[in-house]
UniProtKB/Swiss-Prot annotation:
Biological function: Involved in CDC48-dependent protein degradation through the ubiquitin/proteasome pathway. Direct or indirect positive regulator of GLC7 activity.
UniProt feature, compositional bias: Low complexity: 115-130
Biased segments, Polar residues type: 69-79
GO cellular component, one term: cytoplasm
Domain UBX: 344-421
Ranges for region Disordered: 44-167, 299-348
Biased composition (Basic and acidic residues): 46-66
Keywords attached to this entry: Cytoplasm, Isopeptide bond, Nucleus, Phosphoprotein, Ubl conjugation, Ubl conjugation pathway
Database matches in PROSITE patterns: SEP (PS51399), UBX (PS50033)
PTM sites of type Phosphothreonine: T331
Descriptive protein name: UBX domain-containing protein 1
Localization terms from the record: Nucleus; Cytoplasm
């Protein structure tokens, strides 16, 4: 038999809270940690089922003993009544006969009333011991699971009632209810303990010497932050009609066999790391919301700010994305350069040209220059393929400018804005 690593044994003991011998026994039998854990959890579930069956059998035995004792008492009472009713006075005693007649006359109506009252049942103001036993038996019958049978002539199938009170889900909710009540009663004590633990001293100190000449030694705190226990977190689990949900996460359906492991872990007081998104050894507080009579409702999407990419408005061609923005610390060469004051301005008018690549330029020219001159200037300064066709357009309203010998004044382009667009 291969030797089992100590790390595996310690991990099994931490997950199951068992002794070292039991951990070694399971790991030696199965060899793998996961298989050993599954076998241990299955045995624990079987033990719980056996204990429930034993408790149910004990209740049935107690009920049978009570019914037997009640029937014995009833028969004894009937015998005593017949014996008392059979008593008669001596023939020679008048006093005894008178007392007998008086007793008979005073007590004869009462048994009639009592018999009618006990026969009706609903009109009785008192409950007998038999009524109590009968009511308890009815309650026990209601608590028992109802199983039905289905099938044909040669085959049969036993179907268990899904509303079994001993089911895993009901057991889990009942434990959560009891745990919530205990937490409410002991809540203040836990808060005080937490505050006392938070005020503990941490840091470094001085070690006192044993001799007179011994120097003081500084002792550092070697406890790393990674080895300390993670902070306590809170998780919310909602149980719907179809399944259960952790916070606003996805729905874990009851009919999925993979999710039964999570229910079993929660029922045994352990927190599934993947389900609750916690670390190993981290303390977690689980708040349970019971909504078994409601269907699952998907969480509404939270409204937030805009995120993503967009298109720059006013691009030369609809649908064409604008070039990437230039960092602020860099000045592109294509940007418009302010003209120095000492440079003389040429021409009697100016036209602002907006190129398709985002560059802007202010062209000083004469009003007698032609539109064709403007096209040639844009072609030579566009820094693109000269063979690519384009058009010059008015800024507003947007309409193309004809490339002809019309003067800038006649084309109404004096002190205007011209936009370049690719053809």
């Amino acid at each position: 038999m291969a030797e089992i690593p100590d790390e595996t044994i310690q991990q099994f003991m931490a997950l199951t809270n068992v002794s070292h011998n039991i951990a070694v026994q399971y790991l030696s039998e199965f060899g793998d940690l996961n298989e050993a854990l599954n076998s241990y959890y299955a045995s624990q579930t079987d033990d719980q089922k056996d204990r429930r069956e034993e408790a149910h059998w004990n209740r049935q035995q107690e009920k049978a003993l009570k019914q037997e004792a009640f029937s014995t008492n009833s028969s004894n009472k009937a015998i005593n009544t017949e014996h008392v009713g059979g008593l008669c006075p001596k023939p020679g005693s008048s006093q005894g006969s008178n007392e007998y007649l008086k007793r008979k006359g005073s007590t004869s109506p009462e048994p009639t009333k009592g018999s009618s009252r006990s026969g009706s049942g609903n009109n009785s103001r008192f409950m007998s011991f038999s009524d109590m036993v009968r009511g308890q038996a009815d309650d026990d019958d209601e608590d028992q699971p109802r199983n039905t049978f289905a099938g044909g002539e040669t085959s049969g199938l036993e179907v268990t009632d899904p509303s079994d009170p001993n089911s895993l889900l009901k057991d889990l909710l009942e434990k959560a209810r009891r745990g919530g009540q205990m937490g409410a009663e002991n809540g203040f004590r836990d808060d005080e303990d937490h505050e006392m633990g938070a005020n503990r001293f941490t840091g470094r100190g001085f070690r006192l010497g044993s001799t007179i000449d011994a120097a003081d030694e500084v002792v550092e705190d070697n406890t790393s932050q990674s080895q300390r226990r993670p902070e306590k977190v809170t998780r919310e689990i909602t149980f719907w009609k179809e399944g259960f949900q952790v916070a606003d996460g996805p729905l874990y359906r009851y009919d999925d066999p993979a999710n039964s492991f999570y229910l079993s872990e929660l029922n045994q007081g352990r927190a599934p790391l993947k389900l609750l998104d916690v670390q190993f050894g981290q303390e977690v507080e689980v708040n349970v919301y019971k909504k078994l009579d409601e269907s699952y409702k998907a969480p509404t999407r939270k409204l937030g700010g805009f995120s993503g990419q967009g298109q720059r408005l006013g691009s030369p061609i609809p649908g064409e994305s604008s070039p990437a923005e230039v960092p602020k610390n860099e000045t592109p060469a294509a940007q418009e350069q302010p003209m120095p004051d000492n440079e003389p301005k040429q021409g009697d008018t100016s036209i602002q040209i907006r190129y398709a690549n985002g560059k802007r330029e202010v062209l000083h020219c004469n009003s007698t220059d032609t539109v064709k001159f403007l096209y040639e200037h844009v072609t030579s300064n566009a820094n693109t393929d000269p063979s690519r066709n384009f058009t010059l357009n008015y800024a507003f309203p947007i309409k193309p400018i004809s490339n002809d010998e019309t003067t800038l004044k006649d084309a109404d382009l004096l002190n205007s804005v011209v936009v370049q667009r690719w053809a």
